[in-house]
Amino acid sequence: MFQIMLGCDLEERKYILEGTKNAKLAAWWDRAIDIIPKEGGKGTAIEQVLAHYKFSKEESIAFGDGENDMDMLLSVGKGIAMGNAAEKVKEIAADICESVTDDGIYYYLKSQKLINE
C-alpha cells in the first residue's frame, strides 16, 4: 500500500499512528491527512527523481500549499509557497507566489523568465 487518505480533526491525529513504527502523517488540510510510509513522501520522491536524472538540488524548483508539501519544498533548490498556502508552509518557503486560483505558478515562472509567452 502506498498511502491512505483520512479525514479527521486535529485532536484525533495524535491517536492515528498509535502502535505503528513504519508510517507517518502528511497533513494537506486541517481536516485531512495522508498516512504514508515513514521513509516516503514528496521530498523523498523529489530526491530520487533528481538523483535518477542527475540534476542537482539547486537546479530544481517546487510549488506547494499544504503541510504535506513541506518536505518537498525543502528538498529542492527553491521551494515556493502558493499565496493560499498554510502559514507553516509560507514560513519555510524561499519565496511566495500568487494563489492557485490566481495562476500563481504561471505568473511566478513568467516573472523569473523560466517560461516565455
Where are these regions (language model features)?
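Conserved acidic, metal-coordinating active-site core of Asp-based
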Residues: M1-F63, E67-M72, N84
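Active-site regions of enzymes building and remodeling cell-envelope glycoconjugates
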Residues: G19-L25, G77, A93-C97
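Asp-based, Mg2+/Mn2+-dependent phosphohydrolase catalytic module
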Residues: S75, G83-E117
